[in-house]
Amino acid sequence: MALIEPTAINNKKVIVGMSGGVDSSVSAYLLLKQGYQVEGLFMKNWEEDDTDEYCAAADDLKDAQAVCDKLGIKLHTVNFASEYWDNVFEYFLAEYKAGRTPNPDIICNKEIKFKAFLEFADDILDADYIAMGHYVRRSDESGQSQMLRGRDGNKDQSYFLYTLSHEQISRSLFPVGELEKSEVREIAKEMGLVTHDKKDSTGICFIGERKFTDFLSTFLPAQPGNIETAEGEIIGKHQGLMYHTLGQRKGLGIGGMKNSNDDPWYVVDKEMDRNVLVVGQGGHHPRLMSVGFYADQLHWVDRKGPIDGAQITVKTRYRQRDVACTLTYEGDDRIKVIFDEPVAAVTPGQSAVFYDAELCLGGGIIDSLIRE
């Protein structure tokens, strides 16, 4: 098993974001093993209003405390619920209201885990570094800190961290980024950590196990409308465009239809002005494909960004394979990206993250699509 070798670290204090999961648990252990002075910090980012979510958060805190007790380190707690509401949740609602599909985890990393958390660790806990259980790697070879993909290609989380600056990366450690997930679980089991077989968390943290539609409808009024084929035929009703995203296949409520084949139906467009959900058959329907996109709200890790006309690769959603592309600037905060080959289900509101081989360059928010 490829453990990270201990290094000579004297009196450097690291505050580890302890979530109650296996990745942060092993991160704390590895940093102790390397000789750091380690303390944990458990963040409460959401005020739970029902029993299941409250219990889940309480269980996470209990697991985080058990791991810290086992490792012999302090666990601090902090409540960032108001910061989360103002900076993450309100953005999430505004994007859905505008018909886009945001990624709140990316905003949470930007505003909470690597901003509010870092400030608290600095001001209150006198930290030299913070550490998280993310599957990314840090490189300092160029003279400034840069972010590389995690060693485990299936778990690489650089897509979610592209908004970090090289200054933030220089203050952050990512101990599990050099490991495979299976190795992380093996270490946790060997060390007798209660989190060794705990399921990975999935979905949006403030929704938890609740139905997404039920949750969203408590904050945004639904506006039902027609479902139409790309040819304009009305074939059903939707309960609100905000409940649907491009490329979606499940939950459309479209049964078998006369004169149509057996190919599954996909959301291929959302026409906000008419409140119409447009669907087509097949995952490569022409309305679902794009040859490129425009993006804004740019963030480059090194502050400069790639050169105009750079030929690099891009991910337009997590776990998507990299797609080769050419990037050109349309102004200080807008880019045009053309794929080498058409891509399905590129979605406004989602993040486009750019890479040069293993190096994460940064990215932006997809604003509009280029169909041809």
From Swiss-Prot:
Residues 155-157, 317-318 are annotated as: Interaction with tRNA. GO terms for biological process: tRNA wobble position uridine thiolation. Residues 103-105 are annotated as: Interaction with target base in tRNA. It comes from the Bacteria. Its EC number is 2.8.1.13. Keywords: ATP-binding, Cytoplasm, Disulfide bond, Nucleotide-binding, RNA-binding, Transferase, tRNA processing, tRNA-binding. ATP binds at G17, M18, S19, G20, G21, V22, D23, S24, M43, G133. GO terms for molecular function: ATP binding; tRNA binding; tRNA-uridine 2-sulfurtransferase activity. It is found in: Cytoplasm. The active site is at C108, C205. It catalyses: S-sulfanyl-L-cysteinyl-[protein] + uridine(34) in tRNA + AH2 + ATP = 2-thiouridine(34) in tRNA + L-cysteinyl-[protein] + A + AMP + diphosphate + H(+). Its main location: cytoplasm. GO terms for cellular component: cytoplasm. The keyword Transport does not apply. InterPro entries: MnmA-like, MnmA-like_C, MnmA-like_central, MnmA-like_central_sf, Rossmann-like_a/b/a_fold. The record marks H134, Q350 as: Interaction with tRNA. Disulfide bonds join C108-C205. Belongs to the MnmA/TRMU family. Catalyzes the 2-thiolation of uridine at the wobble position (U34) of tRNA, leading to the formation of s(2)U34. This is tRNA-specific 2-thiouridylase MnmA. It comes from Shewanella sediminis (strain HAW-EB3).
